[in-house]
Amino acid sequence: IGANDGQFGKNLRKIGYKGQIISFEPIVSAYIDLEDTSKKDKKWKVFNFALGKNIEETEINISQNSLSSSILDMKKEHLNSAPTSRYVKREKISVKTLDSFKEEICKNFKNIYIKIDTQGYEEKVLIGAKDLVRQAIGLQLEMSIYPMYESQLLFNEFFKKIEKLNFELWDIERTFSNPKSGKILQIDAIFFKKN
């Protein structure tokens, strides 16, 4: 969720994963690349919309580097740490909830692993995916240690919410740091369902 041009899906195939992949990317230019990447793979479906807690139309801020694009406004700490993350334009997008069409896309799936990288919007995605999260065995979420986007949930609060959903932390990967100070700003956290 927040697939960009399909980097994560490509990596899954490189390490030997042969199962279904379902990717969501709302930005048209990134979606075109994602669609091109996935079209030779019969087990990889792609959708051109965002996921959130409500079904709605909104605008997304497009960043110069594409990877930092977000529905939310960016904080100065982020921009100062990565000047190419600055917003250069806005694009109208559709937002749906994952639960609103989960039957359509993953009706008979087992061992569901959900990866969410939506630049501060991860909590909203989870709210709209409550039913599917209950079925999932794993979650991978980008989380900010310090505020990178307006009104986003930070790691310490997010961690508690994920634990209440019966998941436990398995791994953390540093994904974004201030290049001058080395201060860690964002991580990818991997959680698996408790037995």
Report each predicted region and the residues it spans.
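Phosphate/nucleotide-binding beta-alpha loop and adjacent structural elements of enzyme active sites
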Residues: 1-195
